[in-house]
Design a protein with these regions (language model features):
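Polysaccharide-binding and catalytic clefts of secreted carbohydrate-active enzymes
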Residues: 1-104, 108-122
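Carbohydrate-binding surfaces of carbohydrate-active enzymes
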Residues: 27-30, 58, 70-71, 99-328
Length: 328
């Protein structure tokens, strides 16, 4: 904040700290923001935390780059916002920034199965991963037998595997090989159960592997040229977690985003994800902007220019409410 605001009075003004006598007169008096009533401060601290993740991963990657062979790559398992399965954009990491130091993006995608399998989680989460490097990605973890009530019907494991590949993944790796015998994931079942015996999940994984031995060269590096994109924004995700919709609480942003993405999926309209740090959207015929609660002026101007140049913009309620510091 000191780097952003050399004048502490400007900082107080931007963050509305005269309210309820929260004014900070010296940086040395800066308060602990835990439990703050000022959501602008809380959001700024969460932004700082996301930067710490980016800096840490970049530091790790720089060490690995010193020693890795030219044919080796660097990846990272980026996960997603979570209810009882993967639902959308991760609030605690700016994945677009953090992925810059990676060679290839990696992810884990977990979702309901059996009668509750929709395919939408594979698509939405996969689209996020594909967008991080604007390239193919790796599914570093996904379910085998999975969580309680997730044991796939015969043929579903294969269906899910091909869905990942069709979305642009170059791998499907299962968590995990055999079911563990202790701790919190004791019943998060792997390919094998606790008895290490062959089962239907193992046999179906063998079918998938044998098929990919034959045709895998035709499945890797599948590319897409989509005409529709959905814009993702960490700041708005954070903002709506502090000022949530009445019916969706802390997952407000992701549930608004998913309502749009799931509709596209049901209509069989393929789409990319794009970061809110981008300013040129001209490669897309339609740009969908869910709940852009927090936005700097230059992003709003970029969206306006996109429309003036012939683009079709779809946005929702709770968009353009506040600036990048949650100031309305």
């Amino acid at each position: 904040l000191k780097e952003q605001f050399p004048d502490i009075n400007a900082f107080n003004q931007e963050f509305g700290l005269d309210y309820w006598s929260n004014r900070v007169n010296k940086w040395e008096d800066f308060p602990d923001i835990r439990g703050t009533i000022n959501q602008s401060l809380a959001a700024e601290f969460q932004k700082f935390q996301r930067k710490l993740v980016t800096d840490f991963l970049s530091w790790q990657a720089s060490i690995v780059k010193e020693y890795k062979r030219p044919d080796q790559f660097i990846t990272q398992n980026f996960d997603y916002a979570w209810t009882d399965h993967s639902i959308g954009y991760q609030p605690e990491v700016d994945q677009y920034d953090a992925a810059c130091c990676m060679t290839v993006a990696g992810c884990d995608i977990y979702h309901p199965s059996r009668d509750k399998l929709t395919g939408a989680e594979i698509t939405v989460c996969g689209n996020i991963s594909r967008s991080l490097k604007k390239d193919n990605y790796l599914v570093l973890e996904t379910e085998a037998q999975g969580n309680i009530d997730w044991l796939p019907y015969p043929g579903q494991l294969r269906l899910q595997a091909y869905s990942h590949i069709a979305n642009g993944s170059n791998s499907v790796m299962y968590w995990h090989w055999h079911s563990i015998h202790n701790a919190i994931e004791s019943y998060w079942k792997g390919v094998l159960s606790h008895d290490f015996s062959e089962n239907e999940t193992y046999q179906e994984a063998c079918v998938i592997g044998n098929e990919w031995k034959r045709i895998g060269s035709h499945l890797k590096n599948i590319k897409k040229t989509n005409h529709v994109a959905v814009l993702l924004d960490n700041a708005s995700l954070t903002g709506l977690s502090h000022f949530p919709l009445a019916t969706t609480a802390r997952h407000s942003y992701n549930l608004v985003m998913r309502s749009l993405c799931d509709a596209l999926y049901r209509l069989n309209i393929e789409f990319d994800m794009v970061s809110s740090r981008e300013r040129n959207f001209s490669s897309y015929e339609c740009l969908i902007v869910p709940a852009l609660y927090s936005a700097p002026e230059d992003l709003l101007y970029a969206l306006e220019s996109y429309v003036k140049d012939g683009g079709h913009l779809i946005t929702t309620y709770r968009s353009a409410f506040s600036d990048e510091h949650l100031k309305i």
